[in-house]
Amino acid sequence: MAVKIRLTRLGSKRNPFYRIVVADARSPRDGRIIEQIGTYNPVDNSGENKVTIDEELALKWLKDGAKPTDTVHNILSREGILKTFDEQRHSK
C-alpha cells in the first residue's frame, strides 16, 4: 500500500483550513485517512503559528516510507522535520 502525507481541506469558501494527514495514495483528497499528524492554516492573520505538527508521528511515518506531497514537503522543511529525518537516517 503506497502511503502519502498530504493535506485534506476543511473550512469554508475562501477561508481554507487544512489537516496534515497520512492516507493511502489511491484514496480521494478528503477521503479515508490513516492518521492525522497536524494542521495548517494559511490565512491565519492573528500572528500565531500557522502550522502545528506532531513531530514524532511525522518522523515515524517518514521512517516507515510515507512520501510527502510537494506542499507538505515544503511545510516539513520549514518546520525542520525533514532535516531531523535526514540526520537520523544518515547517522546509522
Curated annotation (Swiss-Prot):
GO terms for molecular function: structural constituent of ribosome. SUPFAM superfamilies: Ribosomal protein S16. InterPro entries: Ribosomal_bS16, Ribosomal_bS16_dom_sf. GO terms for biological process: translation. Keywords: Ribonucleoprotein, Ribosomal protein. One of its GO terms (cellular component) is small ribosomal subunit. The keyword DNA-binding does not apply. Belongs to the bacterial ribosomal protein bS16 family. HAMAP family: Ribosomal_bS16. This is Small ribosomal subunit protein bS16. It comes from Staphylococcus carnosus (strain TM300).
